Regions:
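Hydrophobic transmembrane alpha-helices of multi-pass small-molecule transporters
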Residues: 1-78, 84, 182-319, 417-441
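Transmembrane alpha-helix interface/packing and boundary motifs in multi-pass membrane proteins
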Residues: 16-23, 106-115, 146-158, 338-352, ...
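Residues that define the loop-to-transmembrane-helix transition and helix capping
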Residues: 26, 61, 98, 139, ...
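Membrane-embedded alpha-helical segments and adjacent helix-loop junctions characteristic
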Residues: 49-139, 294-367, 371
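Re-entrant/interfacial helical elements at transmembrane boundaries that shape
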Residues: 85, 118-129, 142-143, 155-170, ...
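Membrane-core helix-loop-helix motifs of multi-pass transport proteins
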Residues: 130-226, 370, 397-432
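C-terminal transmembrane helix pair
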Residues: 135, 179-189, 300, 330-441
Length: 441
């Protein structure tokens, strides 16, 4: 049996188990990563897969960013600022439905400028505080926050790794995501999708009309964590404008810049807290409450995806898309969008987009057309496709991890009740808007 076929079988078994045994997702992913590493590294003769490849597959920038933000979130929660923000939200909206949608919109706005995972970690404590005050389940609000952050990540150059990949490949700057070559760019397609998905959320939560219970305003005990959270947002935005070094140690630091920022701010917060309290209790609490299961799950999935990439599965999918599209631009655009949605629901969209960008460029050259409509279609499909399943995007995995720590195990069916209508609405609107401006006009 060929390496290609075995890789597909292993990958299929992994994802079936991930869906059917949600409590053990981290161990399943870890086991799969070990199997892929040993098999490709020691047994398969036609693929070179070394320890360096395994280590290189793990995105330490993302893991450090998640870990650092998780720690800052612990400080943020202890300061009681999320409770105060929850009090403000409760005073501004009439019922639970409007409060949930408002939090999802807030997550989307923040995520347009900050990494999706960091956004979920920032907004989730507010949602949890609102739900605790109202004595309702936080499952639906957290899912809404996760999928909203994924949607808006494609809006700007700094919102998501896939946007950064496209910007670098197509030589697009921050403002090109708003207006490009005299036409409305991808930002507007995403924002129209965000408006329509807000209506979808209003419909999905139409029965949550119970009035909000108001209480006395919470008193914030420490404002330092709030400044740290704001610092994360500002510094992550500024870091996205740093020029990429040519190589060496500076390039390594550049590739880890978001993670380094979050970890440094966490250390600063812990030092300030220790100086204020003369104790190390908060450091112990941060270490204890870190979501190690989510970190292990993500690290393992990075290796699994690298495994099927090395086995040629992603390249084969790209070739298949080219064969199906032929010379019809609209058909090719349609195939790229919806195939990207389906593929990204199950595999990490970063290696997929990396693989497809040169493929799309070649297809456009063959068809003698500009590649931008295909670039934007690829970005929309690949970014939003991860929204469909609970393990399709890092933000979803993070949200599920937060809920698990709160005692809620979320099944795929429960997640997809929100994610599927949300994603279909966002994809269809983006698909039509992009084709209107870049395929017709």
């Amino acid at each position: 049996m060929s390496t290609f076929v075995i890789a597909i079988i292993l990958f299929a078994i992994t994802y079936i188990l991930l869906f059917t045994l949600p409590k053990f997702r981290h161990w399943i992913a870890f086991g799969s990563a070990v199997v892929f590493s040993l098999w490709l590294g020691l047994i398969a003769k036609d693929v070179e897969f070394t320890f360096k490849d395994v280590f290189g597959a793990i995105d330490f920038n993302v893991l450090m960013m998640i870990a650092g933000t998780m720690g800052i979130v612990v400080l943020f929660i202890e300061s009681k600022m999320p409770m105060l923000i929850a009090d403000v939200l409760l005073s501004k909206f009439k019922n639970v439905k409007l409060a949930i949608v408002a939090m999802a919109i807030l997550a989307g706005v923040v995520s347009a400028f900050v990494d999706n995972v960091a956004t979920v970690l920032m907004i989730a404590p507010i949602a949890l505080a609102v739900c605790k005050k109202q004595n309702i389940s936080p499952v639906a609000p957290i899912i809404s926050i996760a999928v909203s952050s994924n949607l808006q990540g494609a809006a700007t150059l700094v919102g998501d790794t896939t946007s950064i990949l496209l910007g670098g490949y197509a030589d697009m700057n921050f403002f090109d995501f708003f207006v490009f070559k005299g036409k409305p760019s991808i930002f507007w397609a995403v924002e129209i999708g965000a408006f329509l998905t807000a209506l979808i959320l209003l419909y999905l939560f139409r029965k949550e009309t119970q009035p909000l219970t108001l209480s006395d305003r919470t008193k914030v005990e420490d404002y330092v964590p709030t400044f740290l959270m704001c610092g994360v947002i500002v510094l992550l935005i500024l870091a996205s404008f740093l020029p990429k070094p040519a190589g060496g140690a500076l390039l390594t630091l550049y590739n880890l810049r978001n993670g380094i920022i979050c970890m440094i701010l966490l250390v600063v917060g812990l030092i300030i807290n220790a100086c204020q309290t003369k104790k190390s209790d908060m450091t112990k609490k941060v270490v204890k409450e870190m979501d190690y299961q989510t970190l292990l799950l993500l690290a393992s999935l990075f290796v699994v995806i690298q495994g099927i990439t090395s086995a040629g599965v992603i390249n084969k999918l790209a070739e298949l898309l080219v064969d199906l599209g032929g010379s019809n631009l609209f058909l090719m655009y349609t195939i790229i969008v919806f195939a990207s949605v389906i593929i990204s629901a199950f595999v990490d969209n970063i290696p997929y987009v990396l693989t497809m960008l040169p493929v799309v460029t070649g297809v456009a050259a063959t068809m003698n057309v500009e590649p931008y409509v295909l670039y934007f279609g690829l970005l929309v499909g690949a970014t939003l496709g991860g929204n469909i399943t609970p393990i399709g995007a890092s933000a979803n995995i993070t949200g599920i991890g937060i809920l698990r720590k709160e005692g809620y195990e979320v099944k795929a069916k429960e997640f997809m009740k929100i994610s599927v209508p949300f994603t279909l609405t966002a994809v269809l609107s983006g698909y039509l808007i992009i084709w209107l401006f870049w395929g017709i006009l």
